[in-house]
Amino acid sequence: MSQSLKTYYKEKVVPLLMETFEYKNIHEVPKITKITINRGLGEASKNNKALESSVQELAIISGQQPVITKAKKSVAGFKIRDGMPVGIAVTLRSKMMYAFLERLIHLSLPRIRDFKGISVQLFDGRGNYNLGLKEQLIFPEIEYDRIDQIRGMDIAITTTAKTQQEGIALLKALGMPFNDN
């Protein structure tokens, strides 16, 4: 796909979805509002190096500086006190969001071992999609020699779709490789 994902959405996906779901107004067509990338780091409270390397990796992957999330209250069972770092998150919107989604669909997901497509059952029922990745090595920006530990991440794709069918149709039209199960 030589054209950007945003122009592809406007020129091809919007007319397709308007015809499929019989929308009367162009503003009824679902669109992606944001992509949130999140990584929980339980060891971040003890290991500051893990936190720094994760911040650096997520900044490379997303192209945007992540925010360090902190514990809201103390939990003795997890040995965490109020205000300790427990993870990192980055929210992508607009140009960065479409650039990341294009790289995810066309470069990163096909690099997963034994990849047969992603599950349709990861929708939340309101058109939002939540994807969990086991390792950061599927992104071509990450060099194997520079990582200290393999860590996963959660990717949440938030859409304006009202139903699960609309969300599936939107992401499928954008090229998301769903499996048939």
UniProtKB/Swiss-Prot annotation:
Q: List GO terms (cellular component aspect).
A: chloroplast; ribonucleoprotein complex; ribosome
Q: How does it assemble?
A: Part of the 50S ribosomal subunit; contacts the 5S rRNA.
Q: Which gene name does the record give? A: rpl5
The organism is Rhodomonas salina (Cryptomonas salina)
Q: Which keywords has UniProt assigned to this entry?
A: Chloroplast, Plastid, Ribonucleoprotein, Ribosomal protein, RNA-binding, rRNA-binding
Single Gene Ontology BP annotation: translation
Which named protein is this? Large ribosomal subunit protein uL5c
- Role of this protein: Binds 5S rRNA, forms part of the central protuberance of the 50S subunit.
Query: Which domain of life does the UniProt lineage start with?
Result: Eukaryota
Gene Ontology MF terms:
rRNA binding; structural constituent of ribosome
For whether the record's keyword set contains Plastid, the answer is yes
* Annotated compartments: Plastid, Chloroplast
One Pfam annotation, family name?
A: Ribosomal_L5_C
Family membership: Belongs to the universal ribosomal protein uL5 family.
Task: Show the PANTHER family listed in the entry.
Answer: 60S RIBOSOMAL PROTEIN L11-RELATED
